[in-house]
Amino acid sequence: MRKSASLLAAFCVALAVFGFAAPASADVPSLSITQVGYNAYGADTIFNRNQEFVDVKNVGDASVNVAGLVVADQWAKSHEGDNDRNCNTLKVTSLPGVVTGADSSVMLPAGHTVRVYSGRGVPAVSAGGSVHTLFMNSHCGYHGHIWGNGGDTAWITLGANAESFAYDFDNGYTVKP
């Protein structure tokens, strides 16, 4: 009994000294950031902002409802409460090639990818129907380029679940986790 009381006391002291932090969120189930195109070829202009993108892939074995999925950079993530213009974010409400359910569900099939470009364009399906492209049409950042060439963090959030991929400049144009 004395040993148990001593262990409990030691645990309480450690908890008070070092604190306890529960994770703020869990990874987004079955979804992963698989690539970030962060550095457009040449100088950043409004004409090449679609060379910047984020790929979010369903790595699970079943379809995932991605309605409400938010793709954002670190600046947008840190300004969630005061980002009235929704700079540097895209919220999925539909996908090209996917029928939106009566309950507003947007089911991304297993193995399929959502590619979110920073610029403007027409949503489409490519790569044999497995890549669904969306566009932020960002008017924020430098000429609509939102991904930091020197490093940034890509975030995906779905409900209470969030995950991120941080990168640094590596003399390239795209990075993968």
Language-model features and meaning:
Residues 1-26:
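Secretory targeting and sorting signals
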Residues 19-151, 157-177:
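Activation on beta-sandwich/Ig-like modules and their edge loops
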